[in-house]
Amino acid sequence: MNGILISLEGPDGAGKTTVLQEILPEIQKMKREVVPTREPGGVRVAEEIRQIILDPKNTEIDSKTELMLFEAARRLHMQEKMLPALRAGKVVIVDRFIDSSVAYQGYGRDLGVEVVDWLNYFATDGLKPDLTLYFDIDTDVALERIMKNRADEVNRLDLERAEMHRKVREGYLEIVAKEPERFVKIDASQSLEKVVADTLEVLKKRFVSEF
C-alpha cells in the first residue's frame, strides 16, 4: 500500500470531530485524494452497528459485547473503505481508530490492554496509522463541553460516570507515551481556531511533500 493513514484520537469532548470538519477544506488541497471517514461507521453496516453501540436505550450491552461490536464495525470499515483507498494511494483520515478501543475498552472498561491489542490486530491485520493526532483535554473540562454543546444528543458512552472518562484519558496518555514516533499531542483546551491551526501545522510539517 502506498496511501497515507491518519487517525484522530481523544476523549469525548475534546472536539476532534469539529476540528476534522474545519481542516478538511485545507487538507483536501493535498496532491493526493483525501478520504475522510469515522469509527464506528464509515460504511453502511458499520454505521448500523454504531447506532446500536451509542443508543442510550441499549443499557444491556456489557463491556465485552461493546468491544466486539466495535471490532466488527472496524473490520467492515477497513475492508470496504479504508484498504481500497490506501491501496489506491489516497490519504485516509479517520475520526477514531484502534487507539480508541485500547483507551475506552482496555483502560476505561478494564478489559485489559493486551486483549484489546490482540482484537485490534485480528480485526485490522495489523494495520496502524502513519500518524495519529491525539487531542488532549482535562476530563472535567471535556465533560462540561459535552453537557453544554451536546445536551440534546448525548449518547450512551457520554453518560458514563466521570471516573470512566478519567481512566480513558489516562489510558490515552499512556498509549501516546509508548509510541512517540506515531503520535502528536495537541492541546484541545485552546480555542477552536488555535487547535485547528496547530493541527494543520502538524500535518503540513509531517507531510510537507504532499501539499
Curated annotation (Swiss-Prot):
<dbReference type="GO" id="GO:0006233">
    <property type="term" value="P:dTDP biosynthetic process"/>
</dbReference>
<keyword id="KW-0067">ATP-binding</keyword>
<dbReference type="GO" id="GO:0004798">
    <property type="term" value="F:dTMP kinase activity"/>
</dbReference>
<comment type="similarity">
    <text>Belongs to the thymidylate kinase family.</text>
</comment>
<comment type="function">
    <text>Phosphorylation of dTMP to form dTDP in both de novo and salvage pathways of dTTP synthesis.</text>
</comment>
<protein>
    <recommendedName>
        <fullName>Thymidylate kinase</fullName>
        <ecNumber>2.7.4.9</ecNumber>
    </recommendedName>
</protein>
<keyword id="KW-0547">Nucleotide-binding</keyword>
<feature type="binding site">
    <location>
        <begin position="10"/>
        <end position="17"/>
    </location>
    <ligand>
        <name>ATP</name>
    </ligand>
</feature>
<dbReference type="InterPro" id="IPR018094">
    <property type="entry name" value="Thymidylate_kinase"/>
</dbReference>
<dbReference type="InterPro" id="IPR027417">
    <property type="entry name" value="P-loop_NTPase"/>
</dbReference>
<dbReference type="InterPro" id="IPR018095">
    <property type="entry name" value="Thymidylate_kin_CS"/>
</dbReference>
<dbReference type="GO" id="GO:0006235">
    <property type="term" value="P:dTTP biosynthetic process"/>
</dbReference>
<keyword id="KW-0545">Nucleotide biosynthesis</keyword>
<dbReference type="InterPro" id="IPR039430">
    <property type="entry name" value="Thymidylate_kin-like_dom"/>
</dbReference>
<dbReference type="Pfam" id="PF02223">
    <property type="entry name" value="Thymidylate_kin"/>
</dbReference>
<dbReference type="GO" id="GO:0005829">
    <property type="term" value="C:cytosol"/>
</dbReference>
<dbReference type="GO" id="GO:0005524">
    <property type="term" value="F:ATP binding"/>
</dbReference>
<dbReference type="GO" id="GO:0006227">
    <property type="term" value="P:dUDP biosynthetic process"/>
</dbReference>
<keyword id="KW-0418">Kinase</keyword>
<keyword id="KW-0808">Transferase</keyword>
